[in-house]
Amino acid sequence: YPAREAALRAGMGVIGQNGMLITPEYGSRFVIILMATDIMHDAPDSGERGGCLHCGRCAKACPAGAIDARGLSRPERCIRNFMMEGVVAPEALREKMGMRLIGCDICQRVCPMQPKFEAGKTLGLKLCALVTEDQSLFSAAIQKLSGEIGKNAARPQRVRAQAALLAGNSGDAKYLPVLESWANLPFEAVAEHARWAKERLSKAGLDRTNKTD
C-alpha cells in the first residue's frame, strides 16, 4: 500500500488495527491521491506509527476474520478486497458479503477514533435494476452508480459480478433466469458468481419445498 505509507510518512495520521490510515479530521473515511513532484522536503515526525487504541472492536466486528490482535493479518479474507474489482471472489467470502454492492466499512463504523458524521443520502438503487436483461434499465443504473462512485469503479462487468453475488444472497428466485444467462458470459467473474448464485438460490428453493412437504 504505497499511497498509505506515503501519507503516513507525510504525517497525515496513524495506522489503525484494521490497517487503515486514521486522520484526526476524517478518521479513515477519505481517499488518498498522490501527485509526483521534484520538490524536496523533510518528512514531519508526526507520521510515526502508533496512536491506535487497540480496543479490538474492529477485530470482533470483522465478518470474515481478517483482523486480529496483530492487525490486518489476513487481508485475503477482507471482503472489500473482492468487491467491484472484477475478480472471482473466494467462495468462503461470497455469503459474508450479504447484500453489499460496494464496501464493507464495518471496521470503520465501530472504530472509536472515527469522527461523527451526519448520515449521507442513500443511493436508492434496487438490485432488480442491476440483475436484469433490460439493457436500458441496467445502463440507467450504471449511470446513476457512476455519478456516486466514479466510472472506473462502476464498470458494467464489475457491477454485474458483484450484483450476481447479491442476487444469490437475496433468496429471491426471480433472479434465476438472468443468472442462467449470465453464467454463460465470457467474463469469468460474472459467470462464476452467477453459477454460484444460481446454485444457492436453487438449493434454497428446494429446501423450502422439502420443508413444506
State each model region's role.
Residues 1-130:
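Catalytic cores of enzyme domains
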Residues 84, 150-155, 181-190, 213:
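Short coil turns that connect the paired helices of HEAT/ARM alpha-solenoid repeats
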Residues 127-157, 164:
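Alpha-helical adaptor scaffolds
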Residues 160-170, 192-203:
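Structural detector for internal amphipathic alpha-helices that build alpha-solenoid repeat scaffolds
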Residues 188, 193, 197-200, 208-213:
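Long C-terminal interaction/binding lobes of large macromolecular proteins
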